Amino acid sequence: MSGEQRKKEYLAKAREAEEHAQRTPDRHEKESWLRIAQSYRELAKGQ
């Protein structure tokens, strides 16, 4: 997989995590999903 493909995949996973965060009413779960999204965005930047 090329670096550009990997970056797109990480960004897609970040968006999915952000969608999960918006759907959950639980504050702690929301914070967890947002941390996951941030981690994927950081991975995408590193590519």
What are the residue ranges of the model-derived segments?
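Terminal alpha-helical segments
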Residues: 1-47
